[in-house]
Each structure stands twice: as structure tokens, then as C-alpha cells.
Amino acid sequence: MEKYVRIATPEDAHRLAPKVRKADIDEIKASNNITPLRGLLYPFTKLRHKTFSIIGTKEEGVIGMFGVVPCETKDFGIAWLLSSEELINHTIQFLRECPKWVEEMGQDYKYLYNYIDERNIVALKWLEFLKFKHIETLPYG
């Protein structure tokens, strides 16, 4: 795999949306009641977004998208990731590269955050691996 992560395009969102993981679909439905496509296209509506695509094999194509969008609160950025089940085929490379991309996403912000559905165990473990801190649990929905 030559280029694993690159700057995302709206076309990438259209390619990834039909194959987003069920846990991610459930999470964006619970939090914002939107479709995967709408969630993936949302960052492109923000001026200071950083949005990247994770590319698998030639057959897999786009297997994930992630990035950061500005928050209304100064110094805060909202980090996010949506992926397909195919990302599991690239776990080692994904985990190895994550810290540098989190650093890239955080360059313009003092804090990165997001809300995670507690049922999304994979996302919670990933954030724990990246040393994100759990601040509080809030009821939602």
C-alpha cells in the first residue's frame, strides 16, 4: 500500500458512506440523527476543517475518513472518525500512524474532543490507545 492516508475529497465520502460500520452508523444516528453520507460531507462545509481519507487495497478503496472541525468554543476542535469494517484488515498500520495524525489535527487547537456512544467499544478503545481522557458520561437521546 503506497499511500495510506491522504487529504479527503467529497467523492471519498460518497465511496465510504455505503459501507460505514454499523457501530458508527448507530453512533451518528443517536447523536445527530443523520446518515453516514451527511456526516461524512459535513466537514467540507466548515472553513477550517482538516479531513483525511484512509485508503486500503485497490479493491477496498476508501476504508475510513477522519479529521477535525472547528468548534464554536475558542481553542477546541471536534475530532472524528468513521470507517468501514475493512479498516480491521489494516489495524497495525492504522494504530502505528494514528498518533502523528492526531498531532496534525490538533495543530490549530488547544483541545480536541468528541462525544462517543458508550456502545461503540472499538471507538472507545481507540481513543484510550491515543491517550484521550474520558471526562464525563452524559445521557443522550
PLM feature segments, named:
Residues 90-104, 125, 129:
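Conserved acetyl-CoA-binding loop-helix of GNAT-fold acetyltransferases
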